[in-house]
């Protein structure tokens, strides 16, 4: 990928999240007519250009009968490629031409994109808790012996999610006699797959866990984009050392919200407190909110982190403040990939499962 195009995509990625499709697109704004494919190229888009300066494009060839002698070129758009016609000039612009044209306009914004992984080099990871203190916290957050042996142990040993092939006869969460964390109540409505299938490890050019902090502004108003820095991490999951460096790096732009409650409070009033505190801090210019249950003790009980993140995230969206801040979860509850995914799904930017 040419360096100038790389800069263009870095800029675009800082204004909005990528749209995966699958989609083959034909569109016009009365100045341009374009055809394009999604970044994975999962839907076909074929084109033919004739000597009469006509462009034919669609999902199939042969939609219109053409004289083969008049055909100048024909082909198929690859993943993320685009082909356009500038109506006023009567000229066809190919993929490289359009991206060269766009790259000239936005390359200077790349000075604001900072890779945090280079600033957080980790040599030795430390355990925050050991012995009885660790066991008490595991009990507090509802860890079972099965969780430790069948979920955590394989993850620690193989650095990947545990897999099993037995049937699941676990009672439904709402009918279970045993404590079940709130994460267990969240399920996919259906098995979401790509067609054709994509391997996130072997096809990492189109699959990424990269996480960004900050936003350049309104994608529809390029003339008034902010000059704030955009920070990028390779993964939304932060180890304890990484989180320590993260807090130190953002310094005064960090504020911690306590996600515990006491006998004098209840969960509902505590969530209202969190929402009000978050709103005040964002209006004061804080860019990193840390929702933490680390203050848990015999007199302070953890609120389910999913409720905390979801409440603050939704509240800030209603006030149109969400785009000004990142919400970071520091929790002892999160145990497996499902709990990480649900936290991110309800609004967390990063998760530190301390």
Go through each PLM region and give its residues.
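Conserved short alpha-helical segments that host acidic/polar catalytic motifs at enzyme active sites
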Residues: 1-226
